[in-house]
């Protein structure tokens, strides 16, 4: 027969186990989306939370940990295969298995693109914070910058090594309605400058083929 003390201990253990289970949020809970969320909903939720909790924008002590948690959730749910596995085996089994497989943090991925242009064009955190924000992202994602010049005024090439920012740039092109953009994979922005009485027309051309994005300025004058 169970004693009152053993029953009490058993009840305490059940409560502790329940609290641990509830404390372990799913990736859907972290992003604030339902399990049936579409790819688009997941992208929007990630972008909103990443902007809110980025340590250069949010000064709370737990902002960086929250930012990493958000990125980890998005990394999994934005990939169809990873999301399917996650939904099948559950949060605990997936995260434990992920550590054993050596996938590590999403911040260990390698990204090759120019952060100066990123913060200059989209001005995430204000003009006075561009440099600090750029360095913070570089430190998190182990970014290697690589720029090259061509005869067409300037040429920059970005090679996306992972999927974390690939979708972000795609959505940003739609978010910021630059004049002259179309809905194809080839986007142009046209500007006009006059030098010493002559007319010079310049356009910035951005081309995307797969994971490779190239940008250059093409000018023609009379």
Swiss-Prot record:
One of its GO terms (cellular component) is endoplasmic reticulum lumen. Residues 26-90 form the J domain. GO terms for molecular function: Hsp70 protein binding; misfolded protein binding; protein-folding chaperone binding. Gene3D superfamilies: DnaJ domain. The modification Phosphoserine is found at residue 133. Its main location: endoplasmic reticulum. It comes from the Eukaryota. InterPro entries: DnaJ_domain (IPR001623), DnaJ_domain_CS (IPR018253), Hsp70_co-chaperone_J-domain (IPR051948), J_dom_sf (IPR036869). GO terms for biological process: B cell differentiation; ERAD pathway; negative regulation of IRE1-mediated unfolded protein response; positive regulation of immunoglobulin production; response to endoplasmic reticulum stress; response to unfolded protein. It is found in: Endoplasmic reticulum lumen. Residues 1-23 form the signal peptide. Not N-glycosylated. Keywords: Chaperone, Endoplasmic reticulum, Phosphoprotein, Signal, Unfolded protein response. PROSITE patterns: DNAJ_1 (PS00636), DNAJ_2 (PS50076). Residues 91-222 are annotated as: Divergent targeting domain. SMART domains: DnaJ (SM00271). Pfam families: DnaJ. Disruption phenotype: Perinatal death in approximately half of knockout mice. Death is caused by fetal growth restriction, reduced hepatic glycogen stores and hypoglycemia. Surviving adult mice display constitutive endoplasmic reticulum stress in multiple cells and tissues. Elevated endoplasmic reticulum stress in pancreatic beta cells is associated with beta cell loss, hypoinsulinemia and glucose intolerance Conditional knockout mice lacking Dnajb9 in bone marrow show impaired hematopoiesis: the number of myeloid cells is increased, while the number of erythroid and B lymphoid cells is reduced. Changing residue 54 to Q: Abolishes ability to stimulate ATPase activity of HSPA5/BiP. Co-chaperone for Hsp70 protein HSPA5/BiP that acts as a key repressor of the ERN1/IRE1-mediated unfolded protein response (UPR). J domain-containing co-chaperones stimulate the ATPase activity of Hsp70 proteins and are required for efficient substrate recognition by Hsp70 proteins. In the unstressed endoplasmic reticulum, interacts with the luminal region of ERN1/IRE1 and selectively recruits HSPA5/BiP: HSPA5/BiP disrupts the dimerization of the active ERN1/IRE1 luminal region, thereby inactivating ERN1/IRE1. Interacts with HSPA5/BiP; interaction is direct. Interacts with ERN1/IRE1 (via the luminal region). Interacts with DERL1. The J domain stimulates the ATPase activity of HSPA5/BiP, while the divergent targeting domain is required for efficient substrate recognition by HSPA5/BiP. The divergent targeting domain specifically recognizes and binds to aggregation-prone sequences. This is DnaJ homolog subfamily B member 9. It comes from Mus musculus (Mouse).
